[in-house]
């Protein structure tokens, strides 16, 4: 193809480097011509041995600015768990000593997997399902991560609705969680502001009857009106209204694709850092704050001898970066073809880790303050999960001057932390399916509306009187072992079936530089072994979910496992379908199933790279 034939108007053209020869078979050269006009890239690839059908030029929008992409990735990866989980894990597992396994696993597994997903999406320019043209038999992995992201939307949006409810409740002279004279309070409520003394109980016990705890469980959730998951009751209208607002925000952030979402993240991805800085400056001035920070940073290297510390570090790395949800693939698929995805991976993973670590100073300055206020040890107030941000933090903020303003700012931060992460999850579903089915592509806005409405309807179960039980069940099963399984198969598919050498050649075409031996070894050996370890540990250490003293019935646990296995089942189901639908003998079916679609002509000639030992040994 000559360059002059492809020139249309005042477009800019970039010709990527030609591919290196394949390990087996004749030399194959691919010319990738990238053009850009009005923010839309046109890509066209041809082979020296052209396919039988004419080459089509595919049009795909790109991010308006590079910073839109970076903020979207950072906004997705930095979510509520950075605030409520990492600081607690660090404190629980030896303080500063926990950083040793955390940073080790981040460097040898987290960053390589993050880099892999960015490169995979950017080169193939499709969503989580479409990228598996590199190994058609494993396309089910794409549907696995899409389904998981869909499941997560059922309960994650509810957390944002809680934050929105608290945000609106903050616009009062007296915050509703500081007194026991409200209609939802029980006789056991103990107004902390009516007494300067402490009963000496730990806050894990005391919080069961504090105004903040009762406001969350009785005033917001109305949990006292439910006996369990089999007694949900109707949706609460206040939470339903907040959920509607969340869904509306999500729809209008996503309906035009990255052109709209790329602008929204300028607010949602940056505001949390402004608020965290303000909270840190306020927190360190509180009495007891230094005690909390010392507890957070105290180093106990003997804890590194405990397997649980390494397990916590491994799982935190897996979940904190957001690999395996298809979001990174979807976001990077809208990048320019020549974008430096290696640099993006280093920048965003570093920011994610630094945010997790620095948020610990904010959290523990307030926990130290609460411990001194109640005259109890730090360990009695240190916790993770929703209890930290919806019970402990609100009570701490309520004791400050201008408490209503601080509360509004804090819950606005939670709202923005949640919104851009929820946007990422929905974008994974939308992009993954729109790229796969042309009918949906032609009606993207209508399909986006359908996805957010489906998410809303199923989220209604989580805003009933017993909705916290549904929330806990989904949180436990929807994206636990299943997401780890999906990432494991993804890593094996890219590094082993497609091949590290071929994948590295793809990256060289985009960035002009081939990944060095370190990254190739991580993709080929370290990351798959790490993921296998985490999957096995997650199965061996599995414990049924519970909420406080409530134990879920057997049928609920069975339902949870159905949810978990339904997403994982996409891998064998699609593999079986693909294998059976291919023509030829068993060997020919297998060859077509594991060979990239662009190399089908090699299979026709009997030259299957994956059938050679060299392919599996190359690094």
From Swiss-Prot:
One of its GO terms (biological process) is lactation. Its main location: membrane. Residues 560-589 are annotated as: Interaction with TGFB1I1. It comes from the Eukaryota. GO terms for cellular component: axon; axon terminus; cell surface; dopaminergic synapse; flotillin complex; neuronal cell body; postsynaptic membrane; presynaptic membrane. Glycans are attached at residues 181, 188, 196, 204. The chain crosses the membrane at residues 57-95, 96-127, 128-171, 236-255, 256-286, 306-334, 335-375, 400-441, 442-465, 466-498, 516-541, 553-582. Na(+) 1 binds at residues 75, 78-79, 417, 420-421. The keyword Metal-binding applies. It is a multi-pass membrane protein. GO terms for molecular function: amine binding; dopamine binding; dopamine:sodium symporter activity; heterocyclic compound binding; metal ion binding; monoamine transmembrane transporter activity; neurotransmitter transmembrane transporter activity; norepinephrine:sodium symporter activity. It catalyses: dopamine(out) + chloride(out) + Na(+)(out) = dopamine(in) + chloride(in) + Na(+)(in); (R)-noradrenaline(out) + chloride(out) + Na(+)(out) = (R)-noradrenaline(in) + chloride(in) + Na(+)(in); dopamine(out) + chloride(out) + 2 Na(+)(out) = dopamine(in) + chloride(in) + 2 Na(+)(in). Inhibited by amphetamine, bupropion, cocaine and ritalin. Inhibited by zinc ions. Dopamine binds at residues 79, 149, 153, 319, 421-422. Chloride binds at residues 316, 320, 356. PROSITE patterns: NA_NEUROTRAN_SYMP_1 (PS00610), NA_NEUROTRAN_SYMP_2 (PS00754), NA_NEUROTRAN_SYMP_3 (PS50267). Found in the substantia nigra and ventral tegmental dopamine neurons, in fibers of the medial forebrain bundle ascending into the striatum, and within dense fiber networks and varicosities in the dorsal and ventral striatum (at protein level). Lower expression in the cortex (at protein level). Absent from the corpus callosum. Expressed throughout the retina at postnatal day 8. Na(+) 2 binds at residues 77, 79, 82, 320, 352. It holds the Pfam family SNF. The record marks 105 as: Contributes to high-affinity binding to cocaine. Keywords: Cell membrane, Cell projection, Disulfide bond, Glycoprotein, Membrane, Metal-binding, Neurotransmitter transport, Sodium, Symport, Transmembrane, Transmembrane helix, Transport. Disulfide bonds join 180-189. Monomer. Homooligomer; disulfide-linked. Interacts with PRKCABP and TGFB1I1. Interacts (via N-terminus) with SYNGR3 (via N-terminus). Interacts with SLC18A2. Interacts with TOR1A (ATP-bound); TOR1A regulates SLC6A3 subcellular location. Interacts with alpha-synuclein/SNCA. Interacts with SEPTIN4. Belongs to the sodium:neurotransmitter symporter (SNF) (TC 2.A.22) family. SLC6A3 subfamily. This is Sodium-dependent dopamine transporter.
């Amino acid at each position: 193809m000559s360059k002059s034939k492809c020139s249309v108007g005042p477009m800019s053209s970039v010709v990527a480097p030609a591919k290196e020869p394949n390990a087996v078979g004749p030399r194959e050269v691919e010319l990738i011509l990238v053009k850009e006009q009005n923010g839309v890239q046109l890509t066209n690839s041809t082979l020296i041995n052209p396919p039988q059908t004419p080459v089509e030029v595919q049009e795909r929008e790109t991010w308006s600015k590079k910073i839109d992409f970076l903020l979207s990735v950072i906004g997705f990866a930095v979510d509520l768990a950075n605030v409520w989980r990492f600081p607690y894990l660090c404190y629980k597992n030896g303080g500063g000593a926990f950083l040793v396994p955390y940073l080790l696993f981040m460097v040898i597994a987290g960053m390589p997997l993050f880099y892999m997903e960015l490169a995979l999406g950017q080169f193939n320019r499709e969503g989580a399902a479409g990228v598996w043209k590199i190994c058609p038999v494993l396309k089910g992995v794409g549907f696995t991560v899409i389904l998981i992201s869909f499941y997560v939307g059922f309960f994650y949006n509810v957390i944002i609705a809680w934050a929105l409810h608290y945000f609106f409740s903050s616009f009062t002279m007296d915050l509703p969680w500081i007194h026991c004279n409200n209609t939802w309070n029980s006789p056991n409520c103990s107004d902390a502001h009516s007494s300067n003394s402490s009963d000496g109980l730990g806050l894990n016990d005391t919080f069961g009857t504090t105004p903040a705890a009762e406001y969350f469980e009785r005033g917001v959730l109305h949990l006292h009106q439910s006996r369990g998951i089999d007694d949900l009751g109707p949706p609460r209208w206040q939470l339903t209204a907040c959920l509607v607002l969340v869904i509306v925000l999500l729809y209008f952030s996503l309906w035009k694709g990255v052109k709209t979402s790329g602008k929204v993240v300028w607010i949602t991805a940056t505001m949390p850092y402004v608020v965290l800085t303000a909270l840190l400056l306020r927190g360190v001035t509180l009495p007891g704050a230094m005690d909390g920070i010392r507890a957070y940073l105290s180093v106990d290297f003997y804890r590194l001898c405990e397997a649980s510390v390494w397990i916590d570090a491994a799982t935190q790395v897996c979940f904190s970066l957001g690999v395996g949800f298809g979001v990174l693939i979807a976001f990077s698929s809208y990048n320019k073809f020549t974008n430096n995805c290696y640099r993006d991976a280093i920048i965003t993973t570093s920011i994610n880790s630094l945010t997790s670590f620095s948020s610990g100073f904010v959290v523990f300055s307030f926990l130290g303050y609460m411990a001194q206020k109640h005259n109890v040890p730090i360990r009695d107030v240190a916790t993770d999960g929703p209890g930290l941000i919806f019970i402990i933090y609100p009570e701490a903020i309520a004791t400050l001057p201008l408490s209503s303003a601080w509360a509004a700012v804090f819950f606005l931060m939670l709202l923005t932390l949640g919104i851009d992460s929820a946007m990422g999850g929905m974008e994974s579903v939308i992009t993954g399916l729109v790229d796969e089915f042309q009918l949906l592509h032609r009606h993207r806005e209508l399909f986006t509306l359908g996805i957010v409405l489906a998410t809303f309807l199923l989220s209604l179960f989580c805003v009933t009187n017993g909705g916290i039980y549904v929330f806990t069940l989904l949180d436990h099963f929807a994206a636990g072992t299943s997401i780890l399984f999906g990432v494991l198969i993804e890593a094996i598919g890219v590094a082993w079936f497609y091949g590290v050498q071929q994948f590295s050649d793809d990256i060289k075409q985009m960035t002009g530089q081939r990944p060095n031996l370190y990254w190739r070894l991580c993709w080929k050996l370290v990351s798959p072994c790490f993921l296998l370890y985490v999957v096995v540990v997650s199965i061996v250490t599995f414990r049924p979910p519970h909420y406080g003293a409530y134990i879920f019935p057997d049928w609920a646990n069975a339902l949870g496992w159905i949810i978990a296995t339904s997403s994982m089942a996409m891998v064998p189901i699609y593999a079986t379908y693909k294998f059976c639908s291919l023509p030829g003998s068993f060997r020919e079916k297998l060859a077509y199933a594991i060979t990239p679609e662009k190399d089908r002509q090699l299979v026709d000639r009997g030259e299957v790279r994956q059938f050679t030992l060299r392919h599996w040994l190359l690094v």
